């Protein structure tokens, strides 16, 4: 039986469906009540015959108005679970009807919160969600593309043909469709037609998994299967103040830490072999390790070195290895280079089981122009500013988020919550914060636009960062939020309710530059640059600083840490030992980049891996041993971390002996525990009778010496400790006469139980 629906109307709708221009398919398709009857109307491109299977009856569907619109009339509501028997190209299959499920997925409150930028769990609605609706299994798709003319779901199960699954336009610029039969692992994209007739194929901005590069499709993935084992870790993390804990971070890039041979197979958890992901075209015999392999190799290594945290350079999905991960296209997906999202969850779980926190680099400042990504998403500048003077980083070739748009801000803030909630990460480091804060960042005059007050500050980005940090600590009070901010923007680590940006740590870029400039000098000229190693103390309590020697310092012709140092090979190693020991005893949390812990000799290469063969040589073994012991010593001495951000925690003994390039200071904790004396000699000249003042007389045990032979030093020192003399110097009546080895740092602990 045919219907009495106006012929012209159906023909026009059919034409729009065939041309992929229909934005309200539910107005035509699925069960429709009409003049006391129910009409089931479907859209089935390329089908030659369709039958409706409902309540045990089979009804032939006719095509009275358009060759691919099939319909059948029923006397009662068919419900939603009826099936269709479809014949296409001689092949018959049965399926449920996508257009039987008319009701909205995104509720009114969801839409309201999203529109105002405050839906902290928006990923639970956006993207592709496996579910069962009235006993029918499939995937619910939801996308934000307000200016699109039409949107369709492309996938393996519809031959990547946008005609098969047009989505329904909803309020607020949303598009929805439930597709029965789509399963976990199904590849998909969105086909977006613009108002001017262009067509783009886009990956899902909220996709939970993506294909391995260079492929760019999204992958239907579950969020609810992994069973976490880290309840105790999470409970303890959120109950403590992260700032009065020891924090020593191993920054690393998963793809260039170590490689495996391509003929070393990896078997997935379900027993199926996994195709190797090549490390680089120029290294065809090497493949990337997987998340499980990294868990087996990386976690024990970092734990043995004594670090408290692993910091991962960006692991959100990105198409280009050469971006180091900083040009993200898949914000809600761990990169598939190393395995599945659940395998990454297991990696984090293993870290927590071994006492290691996990920090990831988060990049909310910009995004790439790749065609499948966020750029010009719905035919308009949806995620970015339209004016390149505020919407583009020309030097980087990337686009800048439009932080004034609520939905864009929501996308990013919810992404932050997502990583903490879904993957149990413990902290973030926000990359290139300065590029977000200043409208004229890397821009010549005439190529930037002032803010509403005529200034260079990006007030929209400021409000976004404040919102992101406020929401983060609201949900996860024990989290770390670290800013890489290279200017003197005030109050970066002050709470948002005090007008700060709300981070709880900031990389001390000034300290890093001063230290490297100083240590690159010929030691005999360091006396003229004493300020480089002392100046940081005068501002160290203005922010909560983290001292970082990062990946940025060992690329682009900057050489590696070892080769920055002057002198012969022994002196180079001694300089590195002294630098690291000064870093570990200086106020502030710690971060070093992979390879620095054993004296990597080449620059970091994202397509290579570390020079592990160097550990067959004693100087490199010694450097690694030094880092091991520094971390062990650091964690055991609260004076080195308990009061990092309280002026009581540090006091100079002498910072003015520039002639000898020697400094001395105390580290202590306000709770009255032990305190330490640190003496550093930054020249190749040793001193056998060097005197420093101390506040209390007695015995001072030498508890750390970078010149120890186990680190590659010459084993000069103070025979395990020294007694004080009544000799007034540096404002103290008691003093120590010390042997100071060349290019060394010594640490002493006052022992009140041992007599003079």
From Swiss-Prot:
A cellular component term, taken from the record's GO annotations: cytosol
- Enumerate the GO terms in the molecular function aspect: 1,4-alpha-glucan branching enzyme activity; cation binding; hydrolase activity, hydrolyzing O-glycosyl compounds
Look up keyword Transmembrane helix and say if it applies.
no
Gene Ontology annotations of biological process type:
glycogen biosynthetic process
List the InterPro entries: A-amylase/branching_C (IPR006048), Branching_enzy (IPR037439), GlgB (IPR006407), GlgB_N (IPR054169), GlgB_N_E_set_prok (IPR044143), Glyco_hydro_13_cat_dom (IPR006047), Glyco_hydro_13_N (IPR004193), Glyco_hydro_b (IPR013780)
Kindly give the CDD domains that the UniProt entry links to this protein: AmyAc_Glg_BE, E_set_GBE_prok_N
A Pfam entry, by short name: CBM_48
Catalytic residue list: 431 (nucleophile), 484 (proton donor)
Alphabetized, the UniProt keywords read: Carbohydrate metabolism, Glycogen biosynthesis, Glycogen metabolism, Glycosyltransferase, Transferase
Q: Which reaction does it catalyse?
A: Transfers a segment of a (1->4)-alpha-D-glucan chain to a primary hydroxy group in a similar glucan chain
Which intervals of the chain form a coiled coil? none
Gene3D superfamilies, A to Z: Glycosidases, Golgi alpha-mannosidase II, Immunoglobulins
Pathways involved? Glycan biosynthesis; glycogen biosynthesis
Return the EC number.
Answer: 2.4.1.18
- Which family is annotated? Belongs to the glycosyl hydrolase 13 family. GlgB subfamily.
Extract the HAMAP family matched here. GlgB
Q: What does the subunit comment say? A: Monomer.
Summarizing the function annotation, the protein's role is: Catalyzes the formation of the alpha-1,6-glucosidic linkages in glycogen by scission of a 1,4-alpha-linked oligosaccharide from growing alpha-1,4-glucan chains and the subsequent attachment of the oligosaccharide to the alpha-1,6 position.
The record's annotation in NCBIfam families points to: branching_enzym, PRK05402.1, PRK12313.1
Instruction: Write the protein's name.
Output: 1,4-alpha-glucan branching enzyme GlgB
């Amino acid at each position: 039986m045919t219907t009495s629906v106006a012929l012209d109307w159906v023909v026009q709708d059919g034409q729009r469906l065939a041309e992929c221009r229909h934005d309200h398919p539910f107005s035509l398709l699925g069960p429709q009540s009409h003049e006391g009857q129910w009409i089931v109307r479907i859209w089935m491109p390329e089908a030659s015959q369709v039958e409706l299977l409902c309540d045990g009856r089979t009804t032939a569907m006719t095509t009275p108005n358009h060759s691919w619109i099939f319909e059948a009339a029923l006397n009662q509501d068919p419900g939603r679970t009826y099936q269709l028997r479809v014949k296409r190209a001689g092949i018959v299959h049965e399926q449920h009807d996508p257009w039987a499920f008319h009701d909205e997925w995104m509720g009114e409150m969801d839409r309201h919160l999203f529109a105002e930028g405050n839906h902290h769990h928006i990923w639970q609605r956006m993207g592709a969600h496996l579910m069962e609706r009235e006993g029918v299994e499939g995937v619910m798709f939801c996308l934000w593309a307000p200016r699109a003319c039409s949107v369709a779901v492309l996938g393996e199960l519809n031959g990547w043909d946008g005609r098969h699954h047009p989505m329904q336009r909803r309020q607020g610029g949303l598009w929805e469709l439930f597709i029965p039969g789509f399963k976990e692992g199904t590849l998909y994209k969105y086909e977006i037609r613009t108002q001017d007739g262009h067509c783009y194929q886009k990956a899902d901005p909220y996709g939970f998994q993506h294909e391995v590069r260079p492929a760019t499709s999204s992958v239907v993935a579950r969020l609810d299967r992994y069973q976490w084992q880290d309840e105790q870790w999470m409970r303890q993390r959120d109950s403590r103040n992260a700032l009065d804990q020891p924090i020593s971070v191993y920054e690393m890039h998963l793809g260039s830490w170590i490689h495996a041979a391509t003929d070393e197979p990896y078997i997935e958890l379900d027993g199926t072999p996994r195709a190797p992901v090549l490390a680089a075209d120029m290294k065809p015999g090497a493949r990337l390790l997987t998340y499980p392999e990294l868990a087996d190799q990386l976690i024990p290594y970092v734990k043995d070195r004594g670090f408290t945290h692993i910091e991962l350079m960006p692991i959100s999905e990105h198409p280009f290895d050469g971006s180091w991960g900083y040009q993200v296209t898949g914000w809600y997906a761990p990169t598939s280079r190393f395995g599945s999202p659940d395998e990454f969850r297991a990696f984090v779980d293993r870290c927590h089981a071994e006492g290691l926190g996990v920090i990831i680099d988060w990049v909310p400042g910009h995004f790439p122009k790749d065609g499948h990504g966020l750029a010009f998403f719905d035919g308009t500048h949806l995620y970015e500013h339209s004016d390149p003077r505020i919407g583009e980083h020309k030097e980087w070739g990337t686009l800048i988020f439009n932080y004034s748009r609520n939905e864009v801000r929501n996308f990013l803030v919810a992404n932050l919550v997502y990583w903490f909630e879904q993957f149990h990460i413990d902290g973030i480091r926000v990359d290139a914060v300065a590029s977000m804060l200043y409208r004229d960042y890397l821009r010549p005059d005439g190529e930037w636009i002032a803010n509403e007050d005529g200034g260079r500050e990006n007030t929209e980005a400021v409000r976004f960062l404040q919102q992101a940090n406020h929401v983060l600590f609201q949900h996860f009070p024990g989290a770390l939020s670290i800013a890489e901010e290279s200017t003197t923007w005030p109050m970066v680590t002050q709470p948002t309710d005090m007008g700060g940006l709300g981070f709880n740590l900031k990389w001390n870029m000034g300290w890093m530059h001063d230290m490297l400039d100083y240590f690159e000098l010929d030691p005999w000229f360091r006396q003229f640059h004493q300020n480089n190693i002392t100046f940081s103390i005068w501002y160290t309590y203005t922010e909560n600083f983290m001292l970082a020697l990062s990946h940025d310092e060992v690329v682009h012709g900057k050489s590696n840490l070892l080769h920055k140092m002057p002198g012969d090979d022994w002196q180079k190693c001694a300089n590195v030992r002294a630098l690291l020991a000064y870093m570990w005893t200086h106020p502030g949390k710690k971060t070093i980049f992979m390879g620095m812990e054993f004296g990597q000799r080449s620059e970091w290469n994202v397509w290579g891996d570390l020079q592990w063969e160097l550990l067959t040589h004693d100087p490199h073994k010694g450097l690694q041993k030094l880092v091991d012991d520094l971390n062990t010593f650091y964690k055991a001495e609260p004076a080195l971390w308990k009061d990092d951000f309280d002026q009581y925690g540090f006091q100079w003994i002498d910072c003015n002996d520039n002639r000898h390039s020697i400094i001395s200071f105390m580290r202590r904790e306000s709770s009255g525990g032990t305190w330490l004396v640190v003496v550093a000699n930054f020249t190749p000249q040793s001193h056998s009778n060097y005197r420093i003042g101390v506040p209390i007389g007695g015995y001072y045990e030498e508890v750390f010496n970078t010149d120890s032979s186990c680190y590659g030093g010459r084993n000069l020192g103070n025979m395990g400790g020294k007694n004080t003399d009544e000799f007034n110097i540096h404002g103290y009546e008691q003093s120590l006469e010390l042997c100071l080895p060349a290019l060394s740092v010594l640490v002493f602990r006052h022992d009140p139980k041992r007599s003079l």
